[in-house]
Amino acid sequence: PFFIARRYLFSKKKHNAINIISGISVCGVALATLALVCTLSVFNGFQDMVAGFFTAFDPELKITVREGKVFDPHEACIRQVHALSEIDVWTETLEENAMVQYKDRQAMAVIKGVEDNFEQLTSIDSLLYGTGKFLLSDSVVDYGFLGVELISELGTGIQFVDPLQVYAPKRNVRVNIANPTAAFNREYLFSPGAIFAVNQQKYDSRYILTSLDFARRLFNYDTEVSAIEMKLKPGSNIGSVQKKIAGILGDRFIVQNRYEQQADVFRIMEIEKLISYLFLTFILGIACFNVIGSLSMLILDKREDVET
């Protein structure tokens, strides 16, 4: 077969147009296949890169309540989960929207209060830029780590001198038209000398990391939390531990891994990959039909040789 293929590939043909069409068809199939492989490889690499960004900020497992915003972390079922041997780091967090003001600039932000062991839970140190260290508070003031896009919107810079004012509505308090400011809590955050950059707009443009005590004081909570974030011991199977925790907590709580915490982002990426795959497969199919047509013309051209 190789001898026959080489003979007809390099031999002189009667119809030069057939040779040109055949060459174009073969090149079309090769280029379409190359484009399909390269595109899918790029999407897979891009997905891994995005997952790496979230890995540095999101926990391995996260517990949230299915209905409502907050829950009591001292419930019996929560304590039972906390006692699991597979859990290495356990952190309580509280997230809520607030308005922040620096001088004459204002912006809406998400205040995320975390415990001091948050840097053990995630690779937050690798996301910090500036001269400061990861310090949430001291005996005098509370510190706030702002996202890189949020500091640009507020104009604070990495090391801001004036305190950042944070406003949040008081719970179960009606607004007094004569004095509307009385319906809001106001607290102050100071610069720790560092900011964070996750390279994801969701976090960089809205989030402020601070202490859990500050968040509870601002939003009028005592011991409630909005989530419990966990890091497992090395060698633990995340899927099996996730199922075990979900079985203990029941339907009232949601247990998510890193991919489920960012389900919308990865779903969009999968849709983009599918669309690209279908589009390039369609082009490859057209190129294959061209090859079939070229082979048909080549068979007609070589009918005399076949008969002999």
Question: Where are the language model's segments positioned?
Answer:
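Conserved phosphate/oxyanion-binding catalytic-loop motifs
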Residues: 306
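A short beta-strand structural signal in non-transmembrane regions
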Residues: 61-65, 224-242
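Alpha-helical transmembrane segments
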Residues: 9, 20-21, 31-59, 296
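A structural signal for hydrophobic secondary-structure junctions
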Residues: 79-209, 213-219
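Short amphipathic alpha-helices in soluble, non-transmembrane regions
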Residues: 75-82, 125, 241-249
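Peri-transmembrane interface segments
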Residues: 13-23, 234, 238-292, 298-301
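Membrane-interface junction motifs in transport/secretion proteins
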Residues: 47-77
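N-terminal Sec/SRP start-transfer signal
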Residues: 1-33
